[in-house]
Regions:
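Flexible glycine/proline-rich, aromatic-decorated loop/lid segments
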Residues: 1-18
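Regulatory N- and C-terminal appendages and interdomain linkers associated
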Residues: 17-229
Length: 229
């Protein structure tokens, strides 16, 4: 089905040209995961038990695990994106507060997390540039820095760890379109080869390839995809 990469962080982001109601919006992905697995479970009923009621009860028990398992792994992965390993009950709120600020200020999802690591080595400028009004972000940053201190690990090591899970390069939609247009309409696969050579090492920043880190120009937003893309 239609797929794409999100530039600015907005939970309501939808790329499919036919998804007018936002059924497959970014924020709805966990619910859609559950819906898809439930449909799969329905097809498995005859294979689980000859007694339909017993089969449904068994499958329901498994399906009820989806939400807590998803939420657990989401928190683990989001913690790693902001350089945290230790478990703190306040982390969920800390992460969601950042996401809310990003949503309000149209901050780029990929670059926010990548540039956040730079603050640990003295560069606050790059990440602050992603926010129209950085006051809220600055307040959040102070809370995050206090939390990072609890890790009891050198800042340089945390920054390195963050850069191993936060890519600098993703398949930006406008760059993918440029590569496809060149290959299909101009019989030139060089842009595609270049893009692929960068994407195979998404965590390694390459000097001179800054254009591949940038979101699409406003003239190419919103980006729409179609079934069969």
């Amino acid at each position: 089905g239609p797929c794409a990469f999100m530039d600015e962080y907005h939970p309501a982001t939808v790329f499919s040209s036919i998804d007018k109601q936002g059924r497959y919006a970014y924020a709805n992905q966990p619910a859609i995961l559950t819906w898809n697995l439930t449909r799969l479970a329905e097809t498995l009923i005859p294979l689980i038990n000859q007694d339909r009621k017993i089969a449904i009860a068994s499958l329901t028990e498994v399906l009820q695990l989806i939400k807590p398992v998803y939420e657990n792994y989401w928190l683990i992965n989001m913690r790693s994106k902001i350089g945290l390993l230790k478990d703190d009950p306040k982390d969920y709120e800390l992460i969601n507060n950042l996401l809310q600020i990003m949503d309000e200020q149209n901050a780029d999802f990929t670059l926010t997390f990548r540039f956040l690591s730079k603050t640990l080595i003295g560069n606050n400028k790059d990440v602050r540039s992603l926010f129209v009004n950085s006051d809220k972000f600055d307040a959040w940053l102070m809370l995050w820095q206090e939390r990072v201190a609890q890790e009891e690990i050198p800042d340089e090591d945390i920054a390195k760890r963050m850069n191993e899970v936060n890519p600098i390069y993703i398949p930006r939609n406008h760059k993918v379109e440029e590569a496809l247009d060149s290959a299909v309409n101009k019989n030139d696969i060089e842009p595609l080869s270049l893009l692929l050579s960068i994407l195979v090492k998404p965590y390694e920043e390459i000097e001179g390839f800054e254009l591949f880190t940038q979101p699409a120009p406003l003239s190419e937003v919103p980006y729409k995809t179609f079934c069969g893309t």
